[in-house]
Amino acid sequence: MIAADTSILIYAHREEVPEHVSALAWLTRLAEDPLLWGLPVFCLGEFVRVVTHPRIFDPPTRLESALEALFGLLASPSLRVLNPGPRYPELFSQHLREADARGNLAFDAQIAAVCVEHRVTALLTADRDFARFAKLKWLSLSDAPT
């Protein structure tokens, strides 16, 4: 199962970013494919936080538009929201230690841990910091969707 992180959701949503077309193509492919794909639960709130933030986007996305985009993705029948399970605390601490994660990287460790717990085969991301987590394979937007 491929999972997508917040950066992909943001780029697919915001038309003015250079990565918009490729992120939208990836998300469309994932959402329409019958194969399971995942979104770490942490990315849902982070997406809303970023796209509605007036210091990040001018103008920011209206809350209702952000929620509409989010619920549009959640309607994909092949999507699984990846929630922490019983192994999550140990996996999270392992990922924190492995990457010596502090600050913002600690948030990425959460995503990596929940993906590993759900046996995600690759995380689609524009964030190269995920390379610090050896147990998690990642894909970039330049890796064409198949």
Say what each PLM segment does:
Residues 33-34, 76-77, 133:
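Structured helix-beta-strand junction loops
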Residues 8, 43, 87-88, 111, ...:
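Alpha-helix capping/helix-boundary segments
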Residues 1, 112-113, 117-146:
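Acidic, PIN/NYN-like endoribonuclease modules and their adjacent C-terminal/linker elements
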Residues 36, 60, 79-122:
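Active-site neighborhoods of divalent-metal-dependent phosphate/nucleic-acid chemistry enzymes
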Residues 38-41, 125:
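Short beta-strand segments at enzyme active-site cores
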